[in-house]
Amino acid sequence: MAERATHRDRLRALEFEAFVAGAGGRLLHTATLLTGEPSHPPGAYARAERLLHAALARTYADWDGPHGGDPYDLARRELALRFAREGRRHQRPRGGPLDRLTPVERLVLVLRVYEEVGEERTAALLGLPGDRVRAVCARAVAALRAPRRDAGPGRASSHGRAGQRAARGPGAAP
């Protein structure tokens, strides 16, 4: 009996290792998008790795193998929920396009755009109404499309031409 349980545990571990070998890279990229850390050079994304390891540990604890549903969905769900719980503790990302977004906006945008999770599934996953997910996603996309406010000379400014004229002063030549 104990031999059968040991064999089952080894099989479970091998199935999980195969899953991580196949999906680990994409899940790590998702974690780096959520934390806003750069994905290069390797080792520059310590928070994303910690987030992924914690999510994978929980996934392994709930692991039923490929027969218990989609293991990628299970891991992605755990990654998203763990980030949502810890989102306030994550530092704001520095220097990337997602640094202007709140943790909730990053989470919704990553799930909807990068992971291509439907609006209803995203809402169910996060425990939010569908309208709220739609509004958060639209706000995040608008924030990414808007020119940066901290743009220096030669870069776009969020104030546009009117802001440039105002900075030069009234009556100044364009």
Show the residue positions of the predicted features.
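C-terminal flanking helix
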Residues: 24, 28, 98, 105-106, ...
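DNA-recognition helix of helix-turn-helix
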Residues: 126-163, 171-173
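Short amphipathic alpha helix immediately N-terminal
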Residues: 100-121
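Flexible coil/turn residues that form the inter-helical turn or adjacent wing/linker of helix-turn-helix
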Residues: 24, 41, 115-116
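Σ70-family region 2.3-2.4 aromatic/basic alpha-helix that recognizes the −10 promoter
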Residues: 24, 28-32, 45, 49-89, ...
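Short amphipathic alpha-helical boundary/capping segments
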Residues: 90-101, 124, 129, 144
